[in-house]
């Protein structure tokens, strides 16, 4: 007998939870109160931007729509290290150290983006 999971909302967290439940074999139902054009939670206001750490451009190739595009080889993607991400988060913490959850956010950020990409989340 499969488990039934109900997801309320259709933002990033909700859809990620739904995908994870599907991967575990659950039957998933998503309820969204908003009209389709207004759905997507706070993510709809980010223009798809999500912060994640990476050491170099090679780690980004699997995320690109067309990594063989000739412009890619001439692009310097730089890096956004975990240390830089942590420093940026500290700017929002009013002098408090990073929480356990923030540390997980940083350490799992690339892995999470890759996981979302593997499920065609755009």
What are the functions of these language-model segments?
Residues 21:
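Aromatic pocket-lining residues of Rossmann-like dinucleotide-binding sites
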Residues 1-13, 29:
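Beta1/beta-strand and adjacent pyrophosphate-binding region of the FAD-binding site
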Residues 33-122:
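Conserved N-terminal/central alpha/beta ligand/cofactor-binding core
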């Amino acid at each position: 007998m499969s488990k039934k999971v109900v997801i309320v909302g259709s933002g990033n967290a909700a859809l990620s939870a739904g995908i994870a439940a599907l991967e575990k074999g659950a039957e998933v139902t998503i309820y969204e109160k908003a009209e389709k054009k207004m759905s997507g939670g706070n993510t709809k206001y980010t223009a798809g931007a999500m912060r994640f750490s990476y050491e170099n451009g090679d780690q980004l190739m699997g995320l690109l729509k067309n990594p063989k595009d000739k412009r890619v080889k001439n692009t310097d993607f730089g890096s956004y290290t975990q240390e830089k991400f942590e420093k940026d988060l500290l700017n929002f913490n009013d002098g408090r150290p990073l929480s356990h959850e923030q540390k997980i956010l940083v350490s799992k950020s690339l892995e999470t983006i890759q996981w979302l990409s593997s499920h065609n989340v755009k």
